[in-house]
UniProtKB/Swiss-Prot annotation:
Subunit structure: Interacts with pnut.
Record's subcellular location: Cytoplasm, Cell cortex; Cleavage furrow
Coiled-coil residue windows: 216-272
Classification of source organism: Eukaryota, Metazoa, Ecdysozoa, Arthropoda, Hexapoda
Protein name: Hillarin
Annotated source species: Drosophila melanogaster
């Protein structure tokens, strides 16, 4: 029997009970509203806790108003409610911050520091050879982005996007299926679900009683044994009072230990049985949802067919010449590779701006039936793609993993729809399938393996550790993958934090990963391997061993349009006998100007070991960029296995130079195996983090190299480096590094001069060997400019200017023979 709890209140607007999951408040005088009733009393505008206002001039008025209709104090009055004017006037001035690559600072790579510098080996970097970029697949387009790449997305206009796939627009479900008929079938399904949950509850209670009775019997037997032993020891001979007390204390301690031991054993057994029962419950729930989804689809298909006998299902009366509108299939087609790629369906998520807005709006309220929920989501959708999209976005916006449920949740409360999520019997994937059936879409849940959290390249799939589930939905004439759970991950780059004048929720609330919506099979297979081969949706399916050996790439790899410049990369890369191995990644042309890469190298079997003989492992990797190729050349300092993690971020020069923190995300990982090492490896000079060579200087600072275009320079005992400035820069500084020599002792060997737009660096090497040269500069930003030799330089009081930022670095081999 249901008992009201303390958290129930009455809605001020409709006087009905407000449940905790649907509650807004307490507000003025401890008033509450339903989220759906929380509207302006005057105009009905939907309000939030940030946008509502109370009447400040009448204490008895408990109602809520929008900013336009809240009673004002009179004409000409300026207060805190006046369209944010005061907030704008009080807004703090923006400041310049130190860029994370400024000398001596650290930047974050997925939460870890980007400390020291690059990598190693004396002879390992003596080659001038850098291979040219390989050609892209001519029929494939790169460079898709989701909402996180706002500086790209906003530059595209929806009207300018042309697609190879055109879908005839269909009439909404309201045209051919009455809401009441669909709701009637839902109520039948809900009764079946209620019966199933009662069965689950009864079974759990029965198992709980069995465990309780079993341990109670054991407790009584053991207690009787201890008591008998205690009484026997007391009766065997005369005992002093102290001895009797000792025996009594020992007996009490034995009882306490027995109780603790049995409580622990009971908890473990209950946990084990509950886990097994939950697996069985998930199976039964999935089977029920599968059958109910089929029944719902049959109803929709039947009514749709009846309607089509007398009316056209399409909204458009005329079609382009030669185009035959494709009707949505009544029965689920067999799995087959899609003929049209995701890029041909849509090129940017901005195309779904309207349906995404619907999903976000619907997610702000709680519906009591799936019929109401799905009708609100797809009521204005005219294609199967839009229907699948709005369901996908609703789930990602809802963020079910973080949702709070009351313990006394009932099936007829708003959040009772999602009780399967609460109890763990229903997953994102089962829910997505259920909602798709209400929208008339064929959908399946696929089981298999995934390279998910905790997976590292080279790991074999031998047990259930990396088991996962995902969906395939039939849209755009083919089966296409959807991974709601991974798409709903709310991870935000630091550079995407709220800006001045924007609310926190504006930038964080609806973050999602568009890669996992309608993912192309040839990209999806890098992370997911189905148990049923046909659900790879590939023309040439691969084996589990081949899946294990695929490079370990993340969604960002595809969102940035990256691809490997050489054929044959596997999850494990083997070095040659000098300990050398190279990973080369190609960038699309339109991304070369904004992509920045970093990396991390550590021992494969240890998260803590980031150094070798006191030297950072990062100094055994040389990262360089030539053209559209970024290369990571590893020289293992010893035999063994290493983990190379490559990160990337897309930034503009303006973003880079402001000094705002940039958090890099992983794009791919490799296991580097060095089976034998015949050469002693020497670490690279301890320079600033980042790539070697002048490419970054040109890309971000407009500094064009005149004399040396490659990251590796062969020089005599002196060297002149020249650059041309394409925009004003000032306060150049160069630092020289060599293993075994303190940096400050090398400072006198580097000078520079500027003449018009030419800057020249002159280096006189004190001895032969390998050197690293760091170059720093800043944009012209104020009337005073001084040379600074540390990164704690602040702007002068008479003018604001950027702090010194790392510009580029070179690796120089100095020898009299050069």
């Amino acid at each position: 029997m249901y008992r009201p709890n303390f958290y129930e209140s009455t809605c001020l607007r409709c006087s009905e009970t407000v449940y905790q999951v649907d509650r807004v408040g307490p507000l003025k005088d401890f008033t509450f509203f339903h989220s759906g009733c929380f509207k302006c009393v005057h105009c009905g505008t939907k309000l939030t806790l940030k946008t509502y206002f109370n009447n400040q001039h009448k204490q008895d008025d408990k109602e809520v108003y929008c900013s336009s209709h809240v009673p004002k104090s009179g004409p000409g009055h300026l207060d805190q409610t006046s369209v944010g004017i005061r907030q704008a006037l009080n807004a703090p001035r923006t400041n310049k911050f130190v860029n994370e690559q400024i000398r001596g600072t650290r930047s974050e790579v997925d939460g870890g520091p980007l400390g020291g510098s690059r990598q190693s080996t004396p002879n390992g970097y003596g080659s001038r050879e850098i291979s040219s970029p390989s050609q892209n697949d001519s029929d494939y387009k790169y460079g898709r982005f989701d909402a996180s790449a706002l500086h790209i997305a906003h530059a595209l206009k929806q009207t300018e996007i042309q697609k190879a796939y055109n879908k005839a627009r269909e009439k909404p479900i309201d045209f051919y299926l009455a809401r009441e008929e669909q709701a009637h079938l839902e109520m039948k399904h809900r009764k079946e679900e209620d019966d199933l949950y009662r069965k689950f509850a009864s079974k759990r209670a029965e198992e709980d009683r069995k465990i309780q009775d079993e341990f109670q019997d054991e407790w009584e037997r053991e207690l009787q044994r201890l008591t008998h032993k205690f009484e026997k020891e007391l009766a065997t001979s005369r005992r002093s009072r102290d001895e009797a007390n000792i025996l009594t204390m020992r007996h009490e301690q034995q009882k306490e230990d027995l109780e603790k031991n049995m409580t622990l054993r009971r908890s473990k057994k209950k946990e084990s049985i509950t886990r097994k029962m939950l697996e069985h419950e998930r199976y039964e729930t999935a089977a029920l949802v599968d059958r109910q989804s089929s029944e719902m689809l049959e109803l929709i298909s039947a009514r749709r067919s009846e309607y089509m006998q007398s009316e056209s299902i399409f909204l458009d009366d005329e079609f382009s010449e030669g185009a035959v509108p494709v009707e949505y299939p009544l029965n689920a087609p067999i799995p087959a590779p899609p003929a049209v790629s995701k890029f041909q369906i849509y090129t940017d998520p901005i195309e779904f701006e309207d349906v995404d807005r619907i999903a976000i709006s619907v997610a702000q309220e709680d519906q009591k039936t799936f019929t109401d929920l799905v009708r609100q989501l797809v009521g204005r959708c005219t294609t199967d793609i839009e229907k699948a999209r709005t369901i996908f976005r609703w789930i990602t916006v809802k963020n079910l993993n973080a949702m709070h449920f009351d313990d006394d949740l009932r099936g007829d409360t708003p959040m009772g729809l999602l009780r399967g999520i609460k109890y763990g019997t229903e997953s994102y994937h089962v829910l997505f399938k259920r909602l798709c059936s209400y929208a008339g879409l064929h959908c399946v849940v696929i089981k298999g393996y995934s390279k998910s959290a905790g997976y590292q390249p080279g790991v074999k799939f031998q047990d259930s550790r990396f088991r996962n589930s995902w969906n395939a939905v039939y849209v755009a004439g083919a089966w296409r993958f959807v991974q709601c759970n991974w798409g709903a991950r709310h991870l935000v780059n630091a550079k995407e934090a709220p800006k001045q004048g924007r609310g926190k929720n504006d930038s964080l609330r609806y973050e999602y990963d568009d890669h996992y919506f309608l993912t192309d099979p040839r990209e999806f297979i890098y992370e997911f391997y189905p148990l049923q081969e046909e659900w790879q949706l590939l023309k040439r399916p691969i084996t589990l061993r081949e899946f294990e050996n695929l490079p370990f790439v993340r969604s960002l790899f595809f969102r940035y349009g990256l691809h490997f410049a050489d054929e044959g990369y596997g999850a494990v890369v083997f070095t040659d006998d000098t300990g050398a191995a190279t990973v080369r990644i190609a960038m699309p042309t339109d991304m070369q100007s904004c992509l920045i890469f970093h990396y991390n190298l550590k021992f494969y079997d240890s998260d803590e070991e980031l150094s070798y003989d006191g030297v950072s492992l990062k100094r055994f990797v040389m990262q360089s960029v030539i053209g559209n190729i970024v290369a990571f050349r590893v020289h293992a300092p010893c035999s063994g296995a290493f983990l190379l993690d490559i990160f990337a971020n897309a930034v503009t020069p303006q973003e880079y130079l402001t000094g705002e923190p940039m958090k890099f995300k992983s794009v791919c990982k490799f296991k580097i195996c060095c089976e034998e090492l015949q050469t002693v490896m020497v670490p690279l000079p301890d320079c600033a983090s980042g790539e070697w060579g002048p490419t970054k200087a040109t890309r971000l600072f407009g500094l064009i190299p005149i004399t040396h275009q490659d990251p590796l320079i062969f020089a005599g005992r002196s060297l002149d480096l020249q650059f041309r400035m394409s925009r004003p820069l000032t306060d150049f500084m160069a630092t020289l590094h060599k293993n075994g020599i303190e940096e400050k002792k090398l400072a006198k060997y580097v000078t520079h001069s500027t003449l018009d737009d030419i800057v020249t660096f002159i280096i006189n090497f004190p001895e032969e060997g390998q050197y690293g040269l760091d170059i720093y500069t800043r944009e012209l930003g104020g009337p005073q400019h001084h040379h600074h030799h540390n990164n704690n330089n602040s702007s002068s009081s008479s003018g604001e200017k950027h702090l010194l930022t790392h510009c580029c670095k070179y690796l120089i081999n100095s020898s009299k023979r050069n």
